[in-house]
């Protein structure tokens, strides 16, 4: 059994910092978040995954262009044609989006309630997926204590949009600790909100709870450097057996440090920057 864990799509969120450059690839910049998500859906179809989990922030705050929502519906429709269900919750950005309340999603998409945590059961696979959506952007309560108890003998997946302890640079929405997640007794926590990928524990042993942020699909500015994407998770019965990184970003941000001497002029600086860039792309 395998599934995709994604989060923080931020569809149609603008890529910032390149508008001052006339030769920037304007069309690629405009469609980057969409193109990354199309690549992810392509992988889901090629891999014939059993389902997809999206842990919040599909949309980008108060973005009001309904074409964004219609695009998302079309991609969900592609998965529906392949009989791939999607389990998603709404995060802080979705909670303030008009599209969250106004658009009707295909019947293969299952959305967690914002009233209380609930469970979607895939009986044929003995999988229980637990989660709760944000009702409002500033959701500062710890949701974990009210998540359902794990189903004995099944693979239990918790879906949560949270800052988690140790991520002070992110708004402290739905705060919780690693120990609280571990104590819940789920085998896998599919988290969202933090845009950097992390998988805990780093050196996993059999039976340990996996706590994972996939990061966002597409870096949007220089503070979101390096490869971006999602996670392909494989399980056998009630045990997580493998986690594969899926790089789907179509543009990548990277800061390069170039050493210059006191006698170097602009031409030397440009040559050094060029060599550093060639080394990065090699």
Q: What positions do the PLM features span?
A:
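N-terminal active-site segment of His-dependent metallophosphoesterases
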Residues: 1-69
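A generic secondary-structure signal
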Residues: 39, 43, 47, 75-78, ...
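His/Asp/Glu-rich metal-coordinating catalytic cores
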Residues: 51, 62-242
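Generic alpha-helical structural signal
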Residues: 34, 38, 73, 271-274
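Short glycine/proline-enriched loop/turn "hinge" motifs that connect secondary-structure elements
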Residues: 44, 149-151, 246
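Acidic/glycine-enriched edge-of-secondary-structure segments
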Residues: 25-32, 128-133, 254-270
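Catalytic cores of large soluble enzymes that bind and process phosphate-bearing ligands
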Residues: 29-32, 36, 47, 64, ...
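C-terminal functional module detector
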Residues: 225-228, 234-282
């Amino acid at each position: 059994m395998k599934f995709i864990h994604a989060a923080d799509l931020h569809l149609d969120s603008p890529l910032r910092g390149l508008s001052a450059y006339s030769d920037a690839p304007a069309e690629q910049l405009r469609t980057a978040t969409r193109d990354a998500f199309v690549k992810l859906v392509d992988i889901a179809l090629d891999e014939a995954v059993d389902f997809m989990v999206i842990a919040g922030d599909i949309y980008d705050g108060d973005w009001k262009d309904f074409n964004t929502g219609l695009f998302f519906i079309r991609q969900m429709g592609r998965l529906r044609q392949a009989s791939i269900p999607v389990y998603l919750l709404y995060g802080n950005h979705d909670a303030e989006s008009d599209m969250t309340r106004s658009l009707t999603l295909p019947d293969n998409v299952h959305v967690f309630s914002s009233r209380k945590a609930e469970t979607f059961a895939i009986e044929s696979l003995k999988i229980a997926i637990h989660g709760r959506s944000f009702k409002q952007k500033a959701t500062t309560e710890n949701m974990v204590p009210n998540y359902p108890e794990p189903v004995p003998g099944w693979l239990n997946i918790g879906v949560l949009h949270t800052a988690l302890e140790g991520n002070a640079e992110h708004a402290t929405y739905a705060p919780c600790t690693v120990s609280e997640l571990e104590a819940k007794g789920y085998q896998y926590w599919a988290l969202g909100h933090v845009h950097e990928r992390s998988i805990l524990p780093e050196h996993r042993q059999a039976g340990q709870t996996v706590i994972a942020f996939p990061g966002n699909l597409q870096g949007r500015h220089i503070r979101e450097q390096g490869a971006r994407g999602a996670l392909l998770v494989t399980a056998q019965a009630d045990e997580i057996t493998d986690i594969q990184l899926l790089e789907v970003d179509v543009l990548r941000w990277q800061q390069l440090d170039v050493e210059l001497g006191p006698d170097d002029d602009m031409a030397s600086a440009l040559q050094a920057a060029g060599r550093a860039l060639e080394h990065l792309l090699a």
